[in-house]
Amino acid sequence: MKAADVRSKSVDQLSDELVKLKKEQFNLRFQAATGQLEKTGRVTEVRRDIARVKTILREKSQAGK
């Protein structure tokens, strides 16, 4: 997910995306623990996407003040 894609979304969409990414991260952690994880790079990718979404949410909340 690119930062430009994230910036174009509304706050509600970003919140939904954050919930979805956190669920995916949870599932990936369990897959890794049980040895079922095939794409290990996806863990890093999801973690960075979560950081991107949180950063943009914070920027948007700061801009509103």
Swiss-Prot record:
Keywords: Ribonucleoprotein, Ribosomal protein. InterPro entries: Ribosomal_protein_uL29, Ribosomal_uL29, Ribosomal_uL29_sf. One of its GO terms (biological process) is translation. The keyword Ribosomal protein applies. Pfam families: Ribosomal_L29. One of its GO terms (cellular component) is cytosolic large ribosomal subunit. One of its GO terms (molecular function) is structural constituent of ribosome. It comes from the Bacteria. Belongs to the universal ribosomal protein uL29 family. This is Large ribosomal subunit protein uL29. The gene is rpmC.
